[in-house]
């Protein structure tokens, strides 16, 4: 009775054993590509570092006097156990791939040993068989653990010394420049034919296939990976990074393409030094690696809609960066190194948990668009006045109590939104913002709008609505805003519009509901913007005409009534 899975009589002849070697080698899964092996090794090392970092962080936790020691120990032990489990989960695919590579390397070594057992005389009669060009591939094998490293060394030593049929066919047909073999077994058949067909090499229809790349990661020219709906595992992500690095990829789009279990990027991301655009948005990443700072060519980085709570200081090394979108993460602060992004033109950190902005943000002198809305900001740094190229500032949905006077230095500013804050006033320096086109200060606590605000004569849209009981009147000089097209003053306590309102000839949208308006009457306000403008214009003209002419004073008046003694004036008035 033969061994399980082995035909009877296989071990009785050399022919049978050679066939068994062929079968066993053929039964292996496809050998991983070199890039996949390198990626797996990097992933395993990174996962170990991550586990150690989490364990160290847990060990540094200190209890308060009210917490029992044992309770803290239990919590720490649970944290360590979970970190270990997550590490093993992240390494699972990488470990399997490395085991497969080690098995292939071991089989290489065993085949070399088997080749030494065959009669050396047979190979002298066997001609060298050239491999098809398409099957020969130059690779550089990475070691897969200590066992695989020794196996590779043994295989290479045997390859250099062997002269039999196994070796001759392998060297001529399917070996690579470093001794790595594919799962092709045609060399076994060729050796067999040379030994048992009277010394003549038989023709073999099974051509060498070269290194099998069935599991290799394909990266399209546009930087997208495979099927748009396919989610990448950590090992596939790492493999794709390796391939992209070797191809010199310029664009990489991973938007929403990472499996939910992936919480960090492998350090190998730093190899993509030629990358210009990187989109890793809409995933579940918790952090960016320090290696992100090595992407010196990166001009656009989009990481919005992840769970990143902290940025590495190396983010400041992205000196070519023009666009940075970090919206919708869990950032509580920004590193001061962000001030080194001197070419940055657009920065979006909206919908995070920022309580302050670093003063270094003032170094971003080329910044044109800054979005910090929906955070926990109490103030904007005074250095924002140094962002002299700023065109758009979105700072709504925060806790701002005032705007810095330095805002007045932002002369190119066209769009300003500070809605849903706690502003009670606007800085008078805003009079310098002569290029303003849109201003939204709704849902604040404004008590008034400064008169010199109306020097911003290029204004097209103004929203001062929903300041409720605080805002009771508009500036008298609002008529200077002759380019104004939209005005929202709803939900305030405004009773009378200023006379100059009639100068707003371009006004086409007016929202004035929920105000105790008396001038103009409510029925006029309901007719729309131009009806109100016309009414106020007519009212202003009527007021001007109805003012009585003051009599001109003659020299008699100056003589008799210009003395400063009030009693004398009273006596003269009574006498007349």
Curated annotation (Swiss-Prot):
Q: Which family does it belong to?
A: Belongs to the SHOC2 family.
Q: Where are the LRR repeats?
A: 272-295, 296-318, 320-341, 342-364, 366-387, 389-410, 411-433, 434-456, 458-481, 482-503, 505-527
Q: What is expression of this protein induced or repressed by?
A: By light.
> Which tissue types show expression of this protein?
Widely expressed.
Q: Which UniProt keywords apply?
A: Leucine-rich repeat, Repeat
* Annotated region described as Disordered, given as residue ranges: 130-181
Compositional bias ranges of the Polar residues kind:
160-180
Instruction: List where the motif GVYW lies.
Output: 528-535
The molecule here is called: Plant intracellular Ras-group-related LRR protein 4
Q: Does the keyword Repeat apply?
A: yes
Q: Which spans does this entry mark as compositional bias, Low complexity?
A: 130-151
UniProt cross-references to SMART domains, sorted A to Z: LRR_BAC (SM00364), LRR_TYP (SM00369)
PROSITE patterns under this entry? LRR
Q: Which organism was this protein described from?
A: Oryza sativa subsp. japonica (Rice)
BP term (GO), one: response to light stimulus
Q: What does this protein do?
A: Leucine-rich repeat protein that likely mediates protein interactions, possibly in the context of signal transduction.
Gene coding for it: IRL4
Origin: domain of life: Eukaryota
